[in-house]
Amino acid sequence: MDTLFRLVSLHHHHHHQHAASPSPPDQPHKSYPSSRGSTSSPSSHHTHNHTYYHHSHSHYNNNSNTNYYYQGGGGGGGGYYYAEEQQPAAYLEECGNGHQFYMDEDFSSSSSSRQFHSGTGAPSSAPVPPPPSATTSSAGGHGLFEAADFSFPQVDISLDFGGSPAVPSSSGAGAGAGAAPSSSGRWAAQLLMECARAVAGRDSQRVQQLMWMLNELASPYGDVDQKLASYFLQGLFARLTTSGPRTLRTLATASDRNASFDSTRRTALKFQELSPWTPFGHVAANGAILESFLEAAAAGAAAASSSSSSSSTPPTRLHILDLSNTFCTQWPTLLEALATRSSDDTPHLSITTVVPTAAPSAAAQRVMREIGQRLEKFARLMGVPFSFRAVHHAGDLADLDLAALDLREGGATAALAVNCVNALRGVARGRDAFVASLRRLEPRVVTVVEEEADLAAPEADASSEADTDAAFVKVFGEGLRFFSAYMDSLEESFPKTSNERLSLERAVGRAIVDLVSCPASQSAERRETAASWARRMRSAGFSPAAFSEDVADDVRSLLRRYKEGWSMRDAGGATDDAAGAAAAGAFLAWKEQPVVWASAWKP
């Protein structure tokens, strides 16, 4: 008997024991095969004594006041259920203390993991707690939410979460999507999509029942399914309570408080060491920029030698406008390449990095100041004349005054490159106009690296209510696909216990809350597909510049350094369904699924 069927059956069994619970309709229960079996996650066994948070726990088993027991196996890795006391204030804020998010060391509920014997997957005889109801409290606080959290105020989708979870209904939104996932599939995607359809269909009973199931199964310290369920459940809860922007601000503030140069550096370097997710775009973009700059430097040197015989001709000045979110980890390799591949005088390189933020951040300024100092020191070691400037821009990137940046340095700059790494998706409005403004800079090359996902949703007032609901389901499903691939790659690339992995997963949690719960006009998660970006670039007057064979070889050599599963694919076959425009550049694929797109463009 599988996990979810036992959850539903248990509710039916306890229905007669709770007078406040509504009578379920007379219909059969749906079963959901468990995908975990005996898979064990060791996350509940290690000591969380790391940079970001410090935990203090008291252990107990067979507590007389609860129905939770110690089990040695199961999807959550077994172990004792932990109390939730003495958490630091910063930890509680980042993890959503308003609803006791992430308060437990192991959120795997008794019904989702500790009810399975190790290696067999058979249910244990330990009792399972009753479903939350208006009169039932969560004694142990084992899930993401307390029972009272499932009583929502009346909002625009007319939800009323008051009683205990209802038996699955065969009618209403999401009923047709209730096909049981295969044993080899992942249960989180099935349940989360059903829940999203129920939210869009305003099926309050279905939403309530599915959210309770997800609350029982979710854990930010479990396997990929449990983590996805945890983060998306948090986003759905924030959406239903119209608290998305406030929740996101709380999470972002706590994360910013814990930010430092050392922690940022460790996370970025470890991510690049274990995953090609960011190095793929860096290598491809650097290759295109370097080839373009070397051509400009050679042309400048030839012009200088023909016009003057003086030996004091200044080096060619090159400038990069860096619109990225990778903390300048891209540039040391470019500085080294300029030093080793310049035939004559090494050109002077200037980098202007734009750091977009929702609000001015002292922590971000400290980090970028330290990064600039280290880049300047490295450039001196490489013998490259170098200058660095960080521009902190609060608000939409579309409001950035590019002309005020003086990228041409009074006409001294011989060649300008614009590097956009995960930056264009930060433009909330007027994306075509912003790309056109890049064209007016007359750059020698523009490199664009974006994650491959179609998460751009229409504004709420731009379409009918039905279209908006359909768009929510579409964006939710695409976000689930994209973040599943990302989390899966982290799962296979990082060790089970890693501070850096925890930091990256926390960022995923914030991104999911943003995507699911924030209005489209306020969301920063507005990724588009490669074909869509290619259409915008062509409309602005850019033409695709194919990566040279040398650059392609460098990328393939890079991927061989990482675990199996990564590959490079030509993006030429990807098309925009709306306009039929073909993409350009190359894809980084994880298990044959495109996840990152890199391209180069010339005016």
From Swiss-Prot:
GRAS domain residues: 179-602
The entry's keywords: Developmental protein, Nucleus, Transcription, Transcription regulation
Gene from which this protein is expressed: SHR2
Record lineage: Eukaryota, Viridiplantae, Streptophyta, Embryophyta, Tracheophyta
Chain segments carrying region VHIID: 268-354
Record bears the keyword Nucleus: yes
Protein name per the record: Protein SHORT-ROOT 2
Region (SAW), start-end ranges: 517-602
PANTHER family: OSJNBA0084A10.13 PROTEIN-RELATED
Region of interest (Leucine repeat II (LRII)), ranges: 370-406
